């Protein structure tokens, strides 16, 4: 009976599979939004202000960072919780695949969130004259919370590795 329960619990990891498929679909949607922004800016490029162009580029960077975060979570999550990804050619396999444990994934996700928040904050600062001081203050507070959380998680990870080494 105990072995059967263990097998059921172990097999339940496959319930994560639709979640990763959903993330892949989210990545497709991000890609569509990325190209939509590029297509929309093309007719206006010659009349657009430099700061307007910088805001568009920051938006594209933001989408790229979120996309990278999605890919990292999909690939490493699949490999950590479901099964090893087999590619047709080993040379196509990304070098970091199979090397990230849950703690390193958490640290990379936290770093990515800080980077995404930084880009968002920079976009706000570029339009600071149109945004209330209160909103900017709260965005800075939230960003600092992300930064402190990332440092805290990295510190805890470092201490736990030192303690268990």
From Swiss-Prot:
GO cellular component terms, A-Z: plasma membrane
Assigned keywords, A-Z: Cell membrane, Membrane, Plasmid, Transmembrane, Transmembrane helix
Compartments in which it is found: Cell membrane
Primary subcellular site in the record, as a coarse category: membrane
Record bears the keyword Cytoplasm: no
Pfam families: UPF0114
UniProt record similarity statement: Belongs to the UPF0114 family.
NCBIfam families: HI0507
Entry-linked HAMAP family: UPF0114
Protein's UniProt name: UPF0114 protein in repA1-repA2 intergenic region
Organism: Buchnera aphidicola subsp. Thelaxes suberi
Lineage, broadest ranks: Bacteria, Pseudomonadati, Pseudomonadota, Gammaproteobacteria, Enterobacterales
